[in-house]
Regions:
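Extracellular/lumen-exposed scaffold segments
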Residues: 1-221
Length: 221
């Protein structure tokens, strides 16, 4: 189970020390760095990039990848009758960086254990894409992007997790696709809900009864 890392520790120096075969003591100052992945028996959570680098002024895509263990699941932005959605907040990035919201692939309809309750969830690996654009006048050689990720992973019980994740990318003049991550980003985009359509929802309320309908100019499915 992952809990918030005390950010005050960012300012502390660690020490790696050893004594060599001649009895001489050696010490190295060590500063803490955040990893890009967190895991336990129920889930693996990772911050990844679609590209191997970043170009000032151009939009790249990061992704928060969640891979629950068998029989476990995470939640959509509206979890349903139980559960809480994944989030990525408290970003640290160069001043002027534009960071978009998490995008949400379409979830599964998940009944809750012999009850009338229903959840909207992901029972397998899911990637939440995030658009990131650093300022066009950025002059550094590398960029570190860090976020506080929160998730809720459930089987018959739910385990909340929270971990600061970080990724560092070199600055370049042209973007280069990370072939190892290309498929998971492509799959995530295929599963995103279609936003450009003319479907209208119609809701009617009569007492305790609610009716929901949809209207479109042509057959949709």
């Amino acid at each position: 189970q992952h809990r918030r890392f005390d950010t005050s520790l960012d300012e502390l120096n660690g020490l790696l020390a050893y004594i060599d075969d001649d009895g001489q003591w050696h010490g190295y100052d060590i500063k803490p760095r955040y990893a890009n992945v967190a895991w336990d028996h129920s889930i693996e959570v990772e911050l990844i990039a679609e590209t191997t680098n970043i170009v000032p002024g151009e939009t790249i895509w990061l992704g928060l990848r969640l891979d629950p263990a068998e029989h476990w699941h995470t939640y959509w932005k509206m979890g349903g009758d139980s559960g809480e959605p994944t989030s990525a907040n408290e970003w640290t990035a160069p001043e002027g960086t534009n960071i978009g919201e998490l995008l949400w692939p379409s979830p599964h309809w998940l009944p809750f254990y012999d009850t009338d309750l229903v959840n909207f969830a992901y029972e397998q690996e899911v990637l939440h894409p995030i658009a990131v654009t650093i300022p066009s006048d950025y002059e550094g050689d590398t960029v570190e992007l860090s976020t506080l990720a929160y998730w809720n992973v459930c089987e018959q019980i739910c385990i909340p997790g929270e971990q600061r994740l970080s990724i560092t990318l070199p600055v370049a003049q042209s973007l280069e696709l990370d072939v190892g991550n290309a498929q998971i980003f492509a799959t995530a985009r295929e599963q995103l809900p279609i936003t450009d359509h003319d479907i209208k929802s119609i809701i009617a309320v009569a007492g305790e009864r609610v009716s929901l309908g949809f209207e479109a100019s042509a057959a949709v499915f």
